[in-house]
C-alpha cells in the first residue's frame, strides 16, 4: 500500500467547509449569494475519494464492495434512526438504501462499481478513460434538450455524469504519487484565477441563449481542484497540519465529511441571524 497523502486530509477539510457553506443560505439574511461553493466542494471530495480508492487492496469485487458499504452505510443508518427520533423524519428501508445519504452517497456507490472494473481492466488507460468520459459528457449535454434555466450542478442526474471526471482525476493522481512544488504567489494566483473563471462561466446558466456554455466550467473547475491539491500538499499547509490543535481539527473535520454532509441541513436555523456574521461561526462550530 502506498503512503497516505496527508494533503488529502486537508483537502477533505476544505471540501467539508465549502459544501457546508453552500447549504447555509438561510444563515445569510441579506447576502444569500455568499452561500456558494457546493460545486467546488463536491469536486474536491470526489477527487479525494478517487485519490484514495486505488491505494488499498482491491481483491474480489463482492468483498471489495462490501468494504465500501461497511464504511458508508452504518453512518447512513445511524442518521436515519437519529433523524426519526430527534426530527421526526419518516424513512422506510427502501428510502434509506436508495436516498438516505442524499444524492452524493447514491452517486459515489455507483462510481465505486465503475471504478472497480476500470481499475481491474483499464488501469493503464486512465487518461484515455478520462478523455472519453469528458467527450461523452460534453456531447450529451450539447445534444439533450434542457430548460433555458438549466443548472448542470443543480438538482438532477446530469451532475452524476460529469463529477465522475473528478473521481478519475483523483485516481490518476493517487496512482502517480507525484510530488508537486507549490509556489505561493503564482500557484495562488492560478487558483484564484480558476475560481473566478469558474464563476464567470457558471453565470451563463442564467442567460437562456448561452446556457450550454456553462459546460466550459469543467476546465477551470479541474484547475481549481488541481491547485487546491497543490496548496494542501505545500510545506506551509503540512506545517499547519502538524500543529497540535489545528491539525486535530483538520483531521476531525476531514474524517467526518460524510457525517457533516448528512446532518448539516437539519441543524441550520435562522433564529440567530440577528447576530450575523457570528451566527455562521456558531453553526460551523
Protein language model annotation of sequence segments:
Residues 17, 47-50, 111, 170, ...:
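Alpha-helical transmembrane segments of polytopic integral membrane proteins
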Residues 17-25, 79-88, 132-147, 191-207, ...:
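Aromatic-anchored segments of alpha-helical transmembrane domains
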Residues 45-46, 52-55, 83-178:
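Hydrophobic alpha-helical segments with transmembrane-like composition
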Residues 12-15, 39-46, 53-115, 186-195, ...:
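Transmembrane alpha-helical segments and their boundary/interface "anchor" motifs
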Residues 4-7, 14, 26, 30-35, ...:
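Membrane-anchoring hydrophobic segments
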Residues 30-42, 93-107, 144-169, 201-228, ...:
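Interfacial loop-to-helix transition and helix-capping segments at the boundaries
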Amino acid at each position: 500500500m502506498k503512503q497516505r497523502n496527508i494533503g488529502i486530509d486537508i483537502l477533505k477539510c476544505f471540501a467539508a467547509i465549502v459544501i457546508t457553506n453552500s447549504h447555509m443560505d438561510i444563515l445569510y439574511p441579506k447576502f444569500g449569494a455568499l452561500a456558494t461553493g457546493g460545486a467546488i466542494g463536491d469536486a474536491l471530495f470526489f477527487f479525494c475519494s478517487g485519490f484514495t480508492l486505488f491505494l488499498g487492496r482491491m481483491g474480489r469485487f463482492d468483498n471489495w464492495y462490501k468494504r465500501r458499504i461497511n464504511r458508508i452505510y452504518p453512518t447512513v443508518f445511524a442518521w436515519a434512526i437519529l433523524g426519526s427520533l430527534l426530527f421526526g423524519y419518516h424513512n422506510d428501508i427502501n428510502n434509506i438504501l436508495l436516498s438516505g445519504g442524499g444524492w452524493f452517497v447514491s452517486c459515489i456507490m455507483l462510481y465505486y462499481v465503475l471504478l472497480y472494473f476500470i481499475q481491474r481492466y483499464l488501469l493503464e488507460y486512465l487518461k484515455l478513460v478520462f478523455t472519453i468520459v469528458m467527450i461523452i459528457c460534453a456531447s450529451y449535454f450539447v445534444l439533450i434538450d434542457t430548460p433555458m434555466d438549466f443548472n448542470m450542478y443543480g438538482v438532477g442526474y446530469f451532475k452524476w455524469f460529469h463529477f465522475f471526471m473528478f473521481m478519475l482525476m483523483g485516481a490518476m493522481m493517487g496512482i502517480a504519487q507525484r510530488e508537486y512544488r507549490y509556489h505561493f504567489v503564482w500557484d495562488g494566483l492560478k487558483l484564484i484565477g480558476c475560481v473566478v473563471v469558474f464563476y464567470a462561466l457558471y453565470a451563463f446558466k442564467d442567460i437562456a441563449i448561452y446556457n450550454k456554455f456553462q459546460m466550459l466550467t469543467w476546465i477551470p473547475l479541474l484547475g481549481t481542484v488541481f491547485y487546491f491539491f497543490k496548496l494542501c500538499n505545500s510545506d506551509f499547509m503540512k506545517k499547519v497540519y502538524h500543529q497540535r490543535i489545528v491539525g486535530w481539527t483538520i483531521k476531525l473535520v476531514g474524517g467526518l465529511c460524510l457525517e457533516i454532509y448528512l446532518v448539516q441541513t437539519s441543524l441550520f436555523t435562522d433564529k440567530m441571524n440577528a447576530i450575523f456574521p457570528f451566527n455562521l461561526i456558531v453553526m460551523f462550530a
